[in-house]
Curated annotation (Swiss-Prot):
GO MF annotation terms: rRNA binding; structural constituent of ribosome
Entry GO terms, CC: cytoplasm; ribonucleoprotein complex; ribosome
TM helices/strands, residue ranges: none
Protein name, entry field: Large ribosomal subunit protein bL21
Subunit structure of this chain's protein: Part of the 50S ribosomal subunit. Contacts protein L20.
Region of interest: Disordered: 78-104
Function statement: This protein binds to 23S rRNA in the presence of protein L20.
Classification of source organism: Bacteria, Pseudomonadati, Pseudomonadota, Alphaproteobacteria, Hyphomicrobiales
Start-end of Basic residues biased regions: 78-91
Gene Ontology BP annotations: translation
Organism in which the protein naturally occurs: Methylobacterium radiotolerans (strain ATCC 27329 / DSM 1819 / JCM 2831 / NBRC 15690 / NCIMB 10815 / 0-1)
Intrachain S-S bonds: none
């Protein structure tokens, strides 16, 4: 059994006991989180439900494992022969979530 959920503008294929890294969510480690935007649901018997765009009555629950930050991305601009350059770093926040179940 698996589902495709949408969170943070991206889509993720999840099943029970999966661990996913998504955009930053509010909440502390250990808190429960519910994803209501389910785009696709497939049970183990071969039946698949596809939403248009989402499915109602199906939700995915998870637990926040930890919060963290991605590797640094460097934005570097240089204007040749002008002795002009700019270097800026950015680290995006993320949240690691363990999927606890899919309720249909």
């Amino acid at each position: 059994m698996f589902a495709v959920i949408k969170t943070g503008g991206k889509q993720y294929r999840v099943a029970a006991n999966d661990t996913i890294t998504i955009a930053s969510l509010a909440g502390e480690a250990g808190e429960a989180v519910t994803f209501g935007e389910v785009l696709l649901f497939a049970d183990g018997a071969g039946a698949t439900q596809v939403g248009a765009p989402t499915l109602s009555g199906i939700s995915v629950t998870g637990e926040i494992v930890r919060h963290g930050r991605d590797k640094k991305v460097i934005a570097f601009k240089k204007r040749r022969r002008q002795n002009s350059r700019r270097k800026r770093g950015h680290r995006q926040d993320h949240t690691v979530v363990r999927i606890t179940g899919i309720s249909a």
